[in-house]
């Protein structure tokens, strides 16, 4: 009788060890994928020349952000189209050398703010570098599901965690599509193509000036 119990416990222990080994292999695989994406993304962390577009949809509201950046100078715009609001709303942020202009508008009403950093810069490049530290990487590897998928003919890793889905381009570590709860966003990037003439000073002739 004792021998039978011992054999049963050995079988259970072997099954548990096999399951633990499979789980460990899955976590290690995901950890390696995340690490590779972080390493790929490092090439883009300090890029100072890029053009980016971000389009997001949430509760029927559409936001379109565009950004031209070159060596510390930039022209950023955000436009918002609400399902219940026919007026276009948005903001413009311009910086070239020592000159800064911010424009906030809603319909025909426009306010220009000159040479004051009162509008936050628009962050449009989403780089998979948040998980640069070991512990966040390990947590994501343990809790997420990672598969391969195509997003707009781009080969990606699809990372899923609860209501959060993120498509990360395999070759760059750039996030090109994201679903977070009720918000869906898509991103497009081009690097090292922005010229000085792309950063056009906005016309403020029809704006109310706030200095």
Mark where each language-model region is.
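N-terminal leader/targeting segments and the immediate start of mature chains
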Residues: 2-75, 81, 108-109, 198-211
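Generic detector of low-complexity/intrinsically disordered segments
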Residues: 10, 15, 19-21, 25, ...
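Residue-level marker of intrinsically disordered, low-complexity segments enriched
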Residues: 12, 20, 51-52, 60, ...
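Flexible, processing/modification-adjacent segments and terminal tails
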Residues: 27-38, 43, 98-156, 160-161, ...
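Short, solvent-exposed secondary-structure boundary motifs
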Residues: 54-60, 75-87, 130-141, 155-160
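An acidic-aromatic
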Residues: 65-129, 177-188
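Gly/Pro-enriched, hydrophobic low-complexity segments
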Residues: 78-92, 148-209
